[in-house]
Amino acid sequence: MKNYSQYHQDIMNQKLENIRNNIQCSFEFFPPKNSFLEENLWSTVNRLSLLKPKFFSVTYGANTGEREKTYDTVQKIYKKTGIITAAHLTCIDSTPHKLKEIAYNYWNSGIKSIVALRGDTLEKDYRHTMYAVDLVLLLKKIADFDISVAAYPELHPESKNVKSDILNLKKKVDAGASRAITQFFFNIESYLRFRDNCIKNKINIDIIPGILPVCNFQKLKRFSSMTNVKIPKWMLDMFNGLDDDIFTQKIIGSSIAIDMVKKLSCEGVKNFHFYTLNQSDITYSICHILGL
């Protein structure tokens, strides 16, 4: 008689082994605003460094103080861990001259990776507004930066349609982008359709899914409404009645992220970018369960 218990265990082990051998992860942080948050960031960096990620990235604020914090944080993480650390850089609130200065400083200090973004629109009316494609072109003229750009499986909030979104991404790729990191999402079919559209339009770079482990569902709903990210009904049902139970929310959030990585891995996805929110516990748990 067939030992089904052993049979199912072997299947599970094989699936985890396939994931362990075929995928890599990267992690996003944001610059800390005070000493308490800085201590928390370093605790997170130190713990996630143990997973030997492909790279880290550090977000970029829209004012001068935040910019300097990004630069300092990128430098410190890279020097302390030796792991490639990509600096986010936005162009909507800057000038070509200032961007060149920032880029030269990064390159000359050993930071060769940039996440090139337009940045969120601001109330102030900036003339000569630059776009992400302009920033990619500017960076490539300065040095051979390894450049990541943004992609939107569920449409950029300001885009007219899918076609314009794909065209914009293609322009960034043709300008020299090496990969695209997506906005977070929860509908796997949205990502797969987007990837298919990219292939049809000869966009041949890696489209890395951005994974956001849910820690606080109420905050997620508010943020999703601003970013055009759709929350599926099954997910609303899962978190129903848990507004005051953050612990259970984290467990469910971990389960959703693990399931997403497994399913996307079966579809040939090999790289995943985690939005950590500077918290290591849930992200580390997810990666540990996946055997990373």
Curated annotation (Swiss-Prot):
It is an enzyme of class 1 (oxidoreductase). It holds the Pfam family MTHFR. FAD binds at residues 60, 62, 88, 118-120, 132, 152, 156, 165, 168, 171-172. Its EC number is 1.5.1.54. Its cofactor is FAD. Pathway: One-carbon metabolism; tetrahydrofolate interconversion; Amino-acid biosynthesis; L-methionine biosynthesis via de novo pathway. The active site is at 28 (proton donor/acceptor). It catalyses: (6S)-5-methyl-5,6,7,8-tetrahydrofolate + NAD(+) = (6R)-5,10-methylene-5,6,7,8-tetrahydrofolate + NADH + H(+). NADH binds at residues 59, 183. (6S)-5-methyl-5,6,7,8-tetrahydrofolate binds at residues 120, 183. One of its GO terms (biological process) is methionine biosynthetic process. The keyword NAD applies. One of its GO terms (cellular component) is cytosol. GO terms for molecular function: FAD binding; methylenetetrahydrofolate reductase (NADH) activity. Keywords: Amino-acid biosynthesis, FAD, Flavoprotein, Methionine biosynthesis, NAD, Oxidoreductase. Catalyzes the NADH-dependent reduction of 5,10-methylenetetrahydrofolate to 5-methyltetrahydrofolate. Is required to provide the methyl group necessary for methionine synthetase to convert homocysteine to methionine; the methyl group is given by 5-methyltetrahydrofolate. NCBIfam families: fadh2, PRK09432.1. Belongs to the methylenetetrahydrofolate reductase family. This is 5,10-methylenetetrahydrofolate reductase. The gene is metF.
